[in-house]
Design a protein with these regions (language model features):
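N-terminal recruitment modules of adaptor/scaffold proteins
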Residues: 2-75, 163, 170, 174, ...
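Acidic, Ser/Thr- and proline-rich intrinsically disordered linker/docking segments
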Residues: 2-8, 22-23, 28, 73-202
């Protein structure tokens, strides 16, 4: 958390305070991150936290982090973290103490960890983001288990076939088996590796 009231006053005096604000949906088109949304792929913004130097834009496809050097610099680095490639985990929400001005949400996308301070007056909105990220992480975990189970079942079936006597053209049977395995693995990944989590936010 960014600190207590006196620490915040000092930080504000030095221009260092960077408490994020949750942006209203009607203003999503005004944030920098909106320029990098893949509209052609059906990407849609569901949640935005904006601070003096950074934007955290949560979409149905993942997180767009518009990373700024400082509040006074116009230099920005846009980083994309897709649900399809990175699992959400370690989600925590820290509420404010008596003299705190901010609340804090922490989470990770794969190996990338984030910690965002937010105005404590927006706790209820931040709870919604917390719950959405936790649910997405749970779904990803279940899907990962389903993919692993599907692959193991396919492996056991192939081993059973390899131990049996093949009738007919062996090379043709092996070729057909490889094609089946490839298609089956694709189907398993497509079924259990979600790209779109918009329904969780809605």
């Amino acid at each position: 958390m960014a600190g207590n009231l006196f620490g915040k006053m000092a930080a504000d005096t030095l221009g260092l305070s960077d408490i994020g604000k949750i942006i209203s949906p009607k203003d999503f088109d005004k944030v920098d991150g909106d320029d990098y949304i893949m509209n052609e792929d059906g990407e849609k913004i569901y949640f935005v936290i904006k601070s003096k130097s950074d934007e955290y834009v949560f979409t149905n496809r993942g997180l767009l982090h518009v990373d700024g050097d400082s509040a006074v610099s116009k230099k920005r680095v846009v980083k994309r973290h897709d649900f399809y490639y990175e699992k959400v985990h370690s989600v925590t929400l820290e509420t404010a103490g008596t003299i705190d001005l901010d609340i804090e949400i922490k989470f990770s996308f794969g190996n990338n960890s984030f910690s965002i301070d937010v105005d404590k007056k927006q706790l209820e909105q931040l709870k919604n983001l917390y719950k959405a990220l936790v649910e997405i992480g749970r779904i990803q975990g279940k899907n990962s288990t389903s993919i692993e189970d599907g692959m193991n079942s396919l492996k056991m079936a192939n081993e059973a076939i390899s131990r049996s006597s093949l009738q007919g053209n062996a090379s043709e049977i092996v070729k057909e088996l490889k094609n089946y395995n490839f298609k089956r693995m694709q189907n398993i990944r497509n079924e259990y590796n979600n790209k779109d989590f918009g329904y969780v936010f809605e």
